[in-house]
Amino acid sequence: YHLTTDLTDRAIEFIKDAKVIAPDKPFFMYFCPGATHAPHHAPQEWIEKYAGTFDMGYEQYRELVFDRQKQMNIFPAHAELTPLNPYTAEQSVDGKPWPPLDVVRPWDELSDEEKRLFARMAEVYAGFLSHTDHEIGRLLDFLEQSGQLENTIVVLVSDNGASAEGGPNGSVNESKFFN
């Protein structure tokens, strides 16, 4: 069982039902799969697609992604990658330096165990997001196959970028963070 698949199945059924009940009326559906919110989970085969992808470390990976985005003209060729921790030279809102646990530690300062853990967490996150993309695609495929895609407005909004799950020590136990 996976929630995102179930929500997609139910969304498709909702549209089918709406079109049976009132075929000429528009419908409104708010589809919220919750992807990349905790808990991070995805079918194993989606996670394994990313096995080893992040072993190089996050600094090197973000450089590769940024270069690819420039090649795709998402960013102009002259764009520069932002610093990993842009605020460390500034004071925190309380007037003090940024706390060490509020910044991303350089990959080469992590232990081998931390590197394995954080690389695996990135694999799970990526698998979760890719699986969600697949399920959104399945919903769009249904709209196309049922002849409704051309008469449907789809608005895709995300409130997530990176995830705070795992925190600076890798624990997904949120209570532990506050103790």
Regions found by a protein language model. Give the residues of each.
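Active-site-proximal cap/lid insertion segments
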Residues: Y1-N179
